C-alpha cells in the first residue's frame, strides 16, 4: 500500500460525495445538508446551490450549465445561467430505488444509475438500471441487471462506459453506440463470484472489493473507492491491483482525479454510510493526495 500524505481539502460535512474537477476547481455534494459545493482557489468552500431531495452525481452540458441528480425524487436538475435550478429530466418511471451517480458525455447525454431497491429502508437487494437522459431531457433505460450501479466514467474516446457494481463484485463496461445506447455488458474487472443473495449484509460481506465512486487515468486504469476496506484502489483491466491509498479509520465513498496537472486524487471520506448517523454529525471530509498518472476521460 502506498504511503502517501493525505491533505484535508474540506471538512465539517455530513456525507461528501460526487467530487468533480471542473473549470480548475473541485466540486462536490454533501448529502444531508443538501448542498452542492465548490472549493475556491483560496481554499474557501462555497455553497453553489441547494437540492431539497438530496444531491448526488454532477456533470455539465456542452453550454456549461450544470446537471445534478436529485436522489429521492428521482430527477436530474439543471442549473441555469442565473443560478436557478429547474427540472431537466424526471426518471422516476425507470427507478425502483433512489437515483444516484451520473456521468455526462461530451454531447450532453447523461448516464444515471439507480439503487434498484430501498437500501436505507432495509429492503432486500434487487438489481438496478442505468438510464440515458438525452440533452433535451427525454430518458430511457439502456442497461439493466446491475447490482447497485454506482460510479461511472466514459473513456477518453467516448466509446466505452464503465459502471461500478457496488454489490456485484465487479466493474462492468459497455460499448457506447452512436445514438448513446449501450452494447452488451462485459467485465472490466471481476473480484469474485457474483453474489446471488437477497441480503445486503451478506452481499457486502462477500465482496472482496466494493466499488463505489470511480475515476479514470491516462493509462486506462481506474481508481475506485473501495467502500468496505477504507481505501482507494487503482485497478487494471481484469482487476489487478496496481496501487492503493488507505483512508483508515475513515471509509472512502467517491474519488476524482484533477488538479492543475490531473495528478491530484480527491477522496470523499466519512466514518460510514449510515444515513441516521451521518445526517446527525459533521464528520465527513474531502481529502487529497498526489498520484503518478493523470486524469483521463469523463467526468
Regions found by a protein language model. Name each.
Residues 1-12, 41-43, 185-189, 198, ...:
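A short helix->beta-strand "capping" segment at the edge of beta-propeller domains
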Residues 10-25, 51-70, 75, 93-110, ...:
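Beta-rich, blade/repeat-based domains predominating
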Residues 23, 38-41, 46, 62, ...:
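Flexible "stalk/tail and boundary" regions
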Residues 35-37, 75-77, 128-131, 170-172, ...:
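A short loop-to-beta-strand structural motif that recurs across blades of beta-propeller domains
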Residues 46-50, 86-90, 140-144, 182-192, ...:
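Beta-propeller fold detector
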Residues 174-181, 291-296:
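Short loop/turn segments immediately following beta-strands, especially the blade-tip
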Residues 256-299:
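Blade-level signature of beta-propeller repeat domains, shared across WD40, Kelch, NHL, RCC1
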Amino acid at each position: 500500500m502506498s504511503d502517501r500524505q493525505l491533505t484535508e481539502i474540506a471538512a465539517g460535512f455530513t456525507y461528501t460525495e460526487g467530487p468533480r474537477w471542473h473549470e480548475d476547481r473541485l466540486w462536490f455534494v454533501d448529502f444531508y445538508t443538501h448542498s452542492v459545493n465548490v472549493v475556491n482557489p483560496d481554499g474557501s468552500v462555497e455553497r453553489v446551490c441547494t437540492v431539497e431531495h438530496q444531491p448526488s452525481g454532477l456533470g455539465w452540458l456542452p453550454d456549461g450549465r450544470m446537471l445534478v441528480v436529485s436522489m429521492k425524487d428521482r430527477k436530474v436538475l439543471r442549473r441555469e445561467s442565473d443560478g436557478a435550478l429547474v427540472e431537466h429530466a424526471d426518471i422516476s418511471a425507470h427507478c425502483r430505488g433512489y437515483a444516484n451517480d451520473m456521468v455526462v458525455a461530451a454531447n450532453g447525454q447523461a448516464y444515471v444509475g439507480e439503487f434498484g431497491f430501498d437500501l436505507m429502508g432495509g429492503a432486500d437487494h434487487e438489481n438496478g438500471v442505468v438510464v440515458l437522459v438525452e440533452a433535451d431531457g427525454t430518458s430511457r433505460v439502456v442497461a439493466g441487471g446491475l447490482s447497485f450501479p454506482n460510479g461511472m466514467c466514459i473513456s477518453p474516446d467516448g466509446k466505452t462506459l464503465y459502471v461500478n457494481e457496488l454489490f456485484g463484485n465487479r466493474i462492468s463496461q459497455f460499448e457506447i453506440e452512436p445514438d448513446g445506447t449501450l452494447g452488451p455488458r462485459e467485465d472490466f474487472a471481476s473480484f469474485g463470484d457474483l453474489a446471488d443473495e437477497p441480503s445486503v449484509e451478506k452481499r457486502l460481506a462477500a465482496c472482496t472489493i466494493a466499488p463505489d465512486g470511480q475515476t479514470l487515468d491516462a493509462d486506462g486504469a481506474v481508481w475506485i473507492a473501495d467502500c468496505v476496506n477504507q481505501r482507494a484502489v487503482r485497478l487494471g483491466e481484469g482487476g489487478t491491483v496496481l496501487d492503493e491509498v488507505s483512508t483508515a479509520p475513515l471509509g472512502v465513498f467517491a474519488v476524482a482525479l484533477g488538479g492543475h496537472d490531473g495528478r491530484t486524487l480527491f477522496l470523499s471520506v466519512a466514518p460510514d454510510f449510515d444515513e441516521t448517523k451521518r445526517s446527525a454529525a459533521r464528520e465527513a471530509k474531502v481529502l487529497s493526495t498526489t498520484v503518478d498518472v493523470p486524469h483521463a476521460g469523463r467526468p
